[in-house]
Amino acid sequence: MTLDAPERAAALIASATSADLRRARALLDADPALARHDLACACATGEVDEVSRRLAARPVAVSEPTGPNGWQPILYACFSRLLRGDARRAPGIREVVRRLLDAGADPDASFIHDGDWLQVALYGAAGIAGDPELTRMLLEAGADPTDDRDGYHGNEVLYHACEFPDPTCAMLVIDAGARADLVDYDLGRALNFPRPEMIEMFCTHGARPSAGNLHQAVWRRRPPRTVAALIDAGAPIDAPDEHGLTALQIAVRWGEETVAAVLRERGADETMVTATDRGIGACISGAEPHVPTGIVRSELDEMMVLSIQGGHLAATRRLLDAGARIDGDPKSEESPLGQACWRGRAELTRELVERGAALTFRDGGSAIGAALHGSRHCHDPEGGPSMQTVDEIPSDRYAEVLRILLAAGATVPDRLGESGARGTTLVAELGIDPPD
C-alpha cells in the first residue's frame, strides 16, 4: 500500500523519534523533500531554513502543538534521534532549537508518555541525544534541570544522561541545580556502567554516596579509582550489605587485591574479613582449586551471574568448577545463560552451552530469545538498555551468540513476546540465514 504525504510524514516522525532510525532514513532517501513537509518534520530533520520560513510566516507557531504527536515544535527537534544518528543533520537540529528558543519557545516544553511519564525537552538533549551543546543551550535558556511534577514519573534527564561515556551532559544538569535526592539516586544508575570518569564527576559535583553504592561498586568489580572516589565522597566504608558483608569482605571474595588495598588504606576494618572470604577469593583468583566447605551454593550462583554480567570468563569457569549451578539458583528468575545471551557475551555463551546449560528457561523464555531481544535493546553489556539507537548495538557479538545457540540445537521463536518482531526477521538482520 502506497502512503500519501501526510502518512509518510507521520512515519518519518515516528521513526526519527524512536530508537530505530532505519525507516526515517529510507523515507528521506526516497523523498528528501519530506523533511520539509511540515514544521514537525523540519524540526526533527534539522531543516533550518524551512523552520525559519514557517516561523516568519506565523510567529505563534513556535509554541503551538503541531504534527502527528501534537507536540510543541521544539520537542520534535530535541527528541529526534537523528541528532545522534545522523552527523549531517545534527548541526541543523541544534540550530533549529536555537532559533526556536530565540523565537520564544519554552525550554521546559514537555509531553506525557504512556499516561504518566513526564518527558521534557532537556531529557531529549541530555538523556537521549547525550548532546552537550544542546543541553547547555536549553539550560542557559532556563530549562529546569529537575524533571519532576506531581502525579507523573520523572527523573528521566539525569538518569539517562549518566548512561553515556561522556559525563559532560550529566555534569551540566547537576551543576544547573538538579535536585540532590535525584543526583544521589542516579549515582546508582551510573555505577551500572564501567565508567570511572562518570562516577568521579558525580562524587565531585555533590553526590552523596551511600553504603549501597560502595557495595554495588565492589560487587560489580569496578576499578580502584571508582571505589576511592565513593569513599572520599563519604560512602560508609564498613557498613554491611544485605548478605552481612562489608565492602572489604566483598573485595576479598573476588580476589580484588588492588580494591582491597584502597579500602584498607582508607580504614576498612580488617577484622571483619573471615577465612571463608579469603577462601572464596583464593578460588576465584585461581590460587586454590576449591572453595571452603560449608559455602552456601546460592552465594556462588549469585557471584556467577555477576561474573557473567561483567564479562569475567575466568571467574565464571572457576565458580562453575567450585559448585555454582550451570542453570543458576532454582529459586531465582535469573538464568546464567540468559544473562550471557542478552548481553551478547559470546565466549561466556559458548562456555555455558558446552557445559550443558539448558537452552530454555524456567520462566518460559529461551537463550535465543534473550539474544534476539538483546540485539535490539541491550546497548551496553553491563549497563543494559539505554536511550541510544539500535544502530549503536554491535551486531557482531549477537551474531556469534546466535551461531553458538543454533549449532547447539536452539530453535528460533516465532515472535518475541505476543506482538514483538518475528524471530526469523531478527536472525536475518544479524546476517544469519534462518534455519529451515
Explain the meaning of each model-derived region.
Residues 37, 62-66, 107-110, 145-149, ...:
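Ankyrin repeat boundary signal
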Residues 25-32, 53-61, 97-106, 136-145, ...:
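Ankyrin repeat domain, specifically the short helix-to-loop turn at the C-terminus of the second helix
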Residues 14-19, 41-47, 76-93, 120-131, ...:
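Ankyrin repeat A-helix N-terminal signature
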Residues 2-15, 34-38, 176-181, 204-209, ...:
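Ankyrin-repeat-protein effector appendages
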Residues 3-73, 278-307, 311-319, 324:
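N-terminal segments that cap or nucleate solenoid repeat domains
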Residues 224-266:
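Extended, hydrophobic interaction surfaces within ordered domains
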